[in-house]
């Protein structure tokens, strides 16, 4: 718990500073896309994660890899922010900073993140219907769906928005029926 507080003390100010820079330069969406791309890279490449986290790797090598990963189209301000993290030895917090920045961008644009778990893969129409339903329930401008599958649900979906969970799965219905039957005895 103490470690999370210490990480938050580093992550939040840097993410806030990046958001301020993004707003001042009217590049919030571009920076958010850059952060999402980096988060995706952290998920897909253990090699990249290890490289960035390794304190023995020289700063110039890290800058070169970051520049190569971001490509020619990345905004100069964003790239300079990454270089600042390298110079201040805060690059190990990059993943957390990107996660916090994306959360700030969602809040700024009134976008809700919904974790959707279904028994089977959802069709595009089903995803759109869930997004519309979540939008109605939350009053958000838009909804981002984080979709996963879990065959143990048997059927239906479980939707988590913030701390609220909406269980419309067959497994959840069976559990509620079981609790009702056990409770009536």
UniProtKB/Swiss-Prot annotation:
Name the family.
Answer: Belongs to the ATPase delta chain family.
GO-annotated cellular components: plasma membrane-derived thylakoid membrane; proton-transporting ATP synthase complex
Subcellular localization is given as:
Cellular thylakoid membrane
Q: Can the keyword Cell membrane be found in this entry's annotation? A: no
Quaternary state and interactors: F-type ATPases have 2 components, F(1) - the catalytic core - and F(0) - the membrane proton channel. F(1) has five subunits: alpha(3), beta(3), gamma(1), delta(1), epsilon(1). CF(0) has four main subunits: a(1), b(1), b'(1) and c(10-14). The alpha and beta chains form an alternating ring which encloses part of the gamma chain. F(1) is attached to F(0) by a central stalk formed by the gamma and epsilon chains, while a peripheral stalk is formed by the delta, b and b' chains.
Organism, as annotated: Picosynechococcus sp. (strain ATCC 27264 / PCC 7002 / PR-6)
GO MF terms here are: proton-transporting ATP synthase activity, rotational mechanism
Topology in membrane: Peripheral membrane protein
Entry keyword annotation includes Membrane: yes
Q: What is this protein called?
A: ATP synthase subunit delta
Q: Report the function annotation for this chain.
A: F(1)F(0) ATP synthase produces ATP from ADP in the presence of a proton or sodium gradient. F-type ATPases consist of two structural domains, F(1) containing the extramembraneous catalytic core and F(0) containing the membrane proton channel, linked together by a central stalk and a peripheral stalk. During catalysis, ATP synthesis in the catalytic domain of F(1) is coupled via a rotary mechanism of the central stalk subunits to proton translocation.
PANTHER family for this protein: ATP SYNTHASE DELTA CHAIN
Instruction: Name the domain of life this protein comes from.
Output: Bacteria
Q: List the disulfide bonds.
A: none
Q: From which residue to which does any coiled coil extend?
A: none
Q: Which UniProt keywords apply?
A: ATP synthesis, CF(1), Hydrogen ion transport, Ion transport, Membrane, Thylakoid, Transport
Cross-referenced SUPFAM superfamilies? N-terminal domain of the delta subunit of the F1F0-ATP synthase
NCBIfam families assigned to the protein according to its UniProt record, in alphabetical order: ATP_synt_delta
């Amino acid at each position: 718990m103490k470690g999370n507080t210490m990480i938050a003390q580093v992550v939040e100010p840097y993410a806030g500073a990046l958001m301020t820079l993004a707003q001042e330069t009217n590049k919030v969406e571009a920076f958010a896309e850059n952060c999402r791309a980096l988060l995706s890279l952290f998920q897909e490449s253990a090699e990249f994660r290890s490289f960035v986290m390794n304190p023995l790797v020289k700063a110039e090598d890290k800058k070169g890899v970051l520049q190569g990963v971001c490509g020619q189209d990345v905004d100069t301000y964003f790239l300079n922010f990454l270089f600042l993290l390298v110079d201040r030895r805060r690059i190990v917090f990059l993943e957390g900073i990107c996660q916090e920045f994306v959360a700030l961008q969602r809040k700024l644009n009134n976008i809700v993140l919904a974790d959707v778990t279904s028994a089977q893969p959802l069709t595009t129409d089903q995803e759109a219907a869930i997004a519309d339903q979540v939008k109605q329930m939350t009053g958000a401008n838009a909804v981002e769906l984080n979709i996963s599958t879990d065959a143990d649900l048997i059927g239906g979906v479980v939707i988590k928005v913030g701390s609220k969970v909406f269980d419309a799965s067959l497994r959840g219905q069976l559990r509620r029926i079981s609790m009702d039957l056990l409770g009536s005895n």
